[in-house]
Amino acid sequence: MKPMPKQREMRRLRDRISDIERQLSDCRRNNESNADMEREMQRLRDRIMDLDRQLNECKRNGNGTSSEEVNRLKTRIRNLKRSLEICSKDESELYSAYKTKLGRAREQISNLQESLRRERESDKTDSYYRRELTRERNKIVELEKELNKCFDAKYIDEINSKKTRISDLERQLAACKSNGGSNGNMDQYKREIESLKRELAECRRGNNGSHSDCKYYDEEARDCVKS
């Protein structure tokens, strides 16, 4: 026995309700974080339950179901469909906003990654130049030490030369005295000896560590090497 037209219509309506209910469920899962959307979906869910209850009553009543009742159910479904379209539209707008925000976040991440890469490259370059600067400063200090040795050697030679000259003059002075030389010659020897002794003392003071004439020291380089 074929189902009566009204029974077929009720079945179609029930299938339609099931489909709408499924769509609403999907909409709910995609918008759980939105409180307003959640309330709207709950309202739609309540309507579906009410409509489903009425359809069940129609099924129990069988042929007694009036066309007016079926039309009323159709109207309710249309209203429900419009509400679902609103929900879907809101969902689409939320998804579009999410995609826009996600795109901006990805762009920011990409920019940060590029900045990090440049900073790392810059740090490598800075480290290279710092190492080179330290190496050159060490060279400067070593060269200054060698230069200082040269000054020390120079003044050691000068001191030895003056000491030799003093010894020679003292021998000449002694010989002059033993030979009965004139006071003028002896005074000259004495003055020259005293002068050389003063120069020798000044030379020794000037060569205490390093001579003041050595102006080539790089103080900054020495301080950096010490630290």
Curated annotation (Swiss-Prot):
Keywords for the protein's UniProt record, in alphabetical order: Coiled coil
InterPro entries: Pox_A_type_inc
Pfam families linked to this entry: Pox_A_type_inc
Coiled-coil intervals: 4-210
A GO biological process held by the record: viral process
Protein name: 27 kDa A-type inclusion protein
Species of provenance: Vaccinia virus (strain Western Reserve) (VACV)
Classification lineage: Viruses, Varidnaviria, Bamfordvirae, Nucleocytoviricota, Pokkesviricetes
